[in-house]
Regions:
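Hydrophobic faces of stable alpha-helices that mediate helix-helix packing
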Residues: 61, 65-68, 102-109, 137, ...
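C-terminal helix-coil-helix/basic helical segment that borders enzyme active sites and/or dimer interfaces
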Residues: 72-86, 99-132, 145-148
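FAD-binding core of flavoproteins
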Residues: 1-73, 80-83, 175-189
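Generic, well-ordered alpha-helical scaffold segments in large soluble proteins
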Residues: 48, 67-74, 111, 143, ...
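Alpha-helix capping/hinge segments and adjacent helical runs
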Residues: 14, 120, 124-189
């Protein structure tokens, strides 16, 4: 009683899951149903965000790697000037740069996850991996769309969806600007 779920809100990306407003009006939670101790909700929520940020880092790596994988298939098939566009140095260099950044992001995700598993102060590592990996996902998906040319802008091709899906990773579980505040705070700036 007192709980209302609003209508689904259409989004630019990550459209497989519903997104709706949840409204609480005069909701009472019995003491036996409390998670943690009374007054500790904010602290618990902030702790959970750290693990979520590692998940967003991993999601970002997956989006970027998927875009690269699709682009690799495409550049082997698409021909220009009588040869596959994957044979051109510009294409090779763009893909090499993208893969290098994705692998660096993957290592940052692993580092943050390891720190969390070892019960260390993983908050700055979670912030770094989320910030870096989401930035990489957005850059890599843009490059992949570019390599697809006009096709990359069409819903028929998966890199278009990857580019839309990548954007939210810079926003949820804390914006990348907030991640920079956490990182710089851990540096005692």
């Amino acid at each position: 009683e007192g709980l209302t779920v609003g209508p689904n809100i259409e989004r630019m990306g990550i459209r497989a899951a519903s997104n709706c407003e949840v409204i609480y009006e005069n909701v009472r939670v019995p003491k036996e149903n409390l998670l943690g101790k009374e007054g500790q909700g904010y602290k618990i929520a902030m702790t959970a965000l750290g693990g979520g940020r590692i998940g967003i880092g991993a999601q970002s790596v997956g989006i970027a790697q998927g875009a690269i994988d699709e682009t690799l298939k495409y550049v082997k098939e698409r021909k220009q000037g009588g040869k596959p566009i994957g044979k051109y140095q510009n294409t090779q260099f763009k893909l090499a740069e993208c893969q290098t950044k994705v692998d660096a992001a993957r290592l940052m995700v692993w580092r943050a996850a390891t720190e969390k598993d070892n019960h260390g102060n993983y908050a700055p590592y979670a912030a770094m991996c989320k910030y870096f990996a989401s930035d990489v996902a957005n850059e890599v998906t843009r490059q992949c769309v570019q390599l697809f040319g006009g096709y990359g802008y069409c819903r028929e091709y998966p890199v278009e969806r990857a580019m839309r899906d990548a954007k939210i990773t810079e926003i949820y579980e804390g914006t990348n600007e907030a991640m920079k505040m956490i990182i710089s705070g851990s540096m005692k700036v």
